[in-house]
Amino acid sequence: MQEAANGVPLVQITAPTAGGVSRNRYADFNVPERGAVLNNSYTPTQTQLAGYVQGNPHMNRGTAKVIVNEVTSGRPTALNGFMEVAGRAASVVVANPDGIRVNGGGFINTSRAVLTTGRPQYGSDGSLRTLQVAQGTVRVDGKGLDARGADSLTVLTRAAEINAGIWAKEAGIVTGANDIDYDTGALTVTRGKDGKPEVALDVAAIGGMYANRIYLIGTEKGLGVRTAGTLIAAGDIVLEADGSLHARKDGRISGENVTIKAGEADNEGLIAADKKVSIQAATIVNRGTGKLYGGDIALQGTAVTNRKDEALEKELERAVAALGQAERELDEAYGADITKFTAKEDLAAYNERIETASRAYDTKLQAVKAVTACMDEMPSPVMAARKTLTVNAADKVVNAAGAMLYSGRDMHLRAGNTITNKGAVIESLGAMTLAAPVVENTNGAFSAKRIGGAWTTNPDMIRIDQYDHPERGRIFAKDEFSSLGSGYGAHHHGSAMEQYAPAYDRITQPTAEEIAAGAQPVPEEEVGKKIANYE
């Protein structure tokens, strides 16, 4: 390695093969803050980093199309400055199986920039055929990585850590143990070395990617993507992971279209698209601070959930159940027949039972208020489509605890088993289609210009799930309910009438024993009528 007149490192790259590849091998390959020039010109040429540089005699038969920089030492590469291709633009590949650390790195006059922990494999003509990735991490820190001087940036690595910004025209990261075809990007999943990393791709809160197009692909089984940073594309964002996607509350994923395929999608951040958000995962969870915004939103999985905090909701359910039990015990204490008391001790014991039950009730009530206050302080998750919202779940759709499903036009919710709206809002400014064997609406609101589907065409059932409801857990045919589309919950006819039952008795024929004791038979036309049982 030489130096230009201003001290910038100057690499006189090797002559290209018949396949157009300049293959350069180093014990160590590091780029200092002042940068480095890869000389791809036979004649003296002007550069941004080093001014005029002398010609590279190795280029006497033609320049390289691809410049490969292979590291063999077992030590990671540090890219702390820009790499500039002098002369004709070429693709630049930095390959180090032991890792690459970027802190202020970048590219100038580069066709395609590739950072990889893979080992290059060449064809018989010396062309670069594949990159075999089995280990290593590419990490971006500090001043980040500016690849806007390249047509595209590709990172091929076992795992990636993004702790700073990445800027590119087009940016792609492929993680996992893979053999990747250099020309087409086609990949074959292989077995990695040295055990699995914790996650395939980790984007910290201070990290981010900014490009016209972004694609992130993780192939290693069970490994996912964790992002608390920012992914912004003027065009499409594609994210595919064999494991889970966890977008934390400070995370932002935003593009013209956002497409996600993962084993599990768990969102606490913002996922937004000008046109369409499409998520396909076994379980899709939008919770707490989670926001899904798009022109259209399409979700497909086994279970789709939109709720604040499931653990806190269950805690509230337990607290309410305990309060109900305390209320029943207090009623029992008050319900003792004081006319049967025969001593002062009986009255004293009665008062003590009431006092004990009252204290227990107050304690349980405070517990409910505490959990409720905690939930009230939490933000509510939202899935909102300016146009159409479509949810297809093989098992269930859950919208709970102040969450909201919204569509500016039509909404289609389909579930193999249940659609649950519990203390939440489902609103469509167009037509709403609900298709599921069981639709549960507890302290929730449905609102739509027109509701169709399961409620009007299917012989489906509705389960009552309101806390302390006397019929909670029981399932009834939907035609036993009224106000299904009112937006304020449904009413079960049986429950409503039973509320008045204690005030009336139904006239019945006396039993044989009662007639024998002197009771008079009742005219048949009177049997079944109600009669007030109060004065």
Feature names for model-found ranges:
Residues 1-233, 240:
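Solvent-exposed adhesion/ligand-recognition segments of exported proteins
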Residues 135-139, 191, 195-200, 222, ...:
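Binding/recognition "hotspot" determinant
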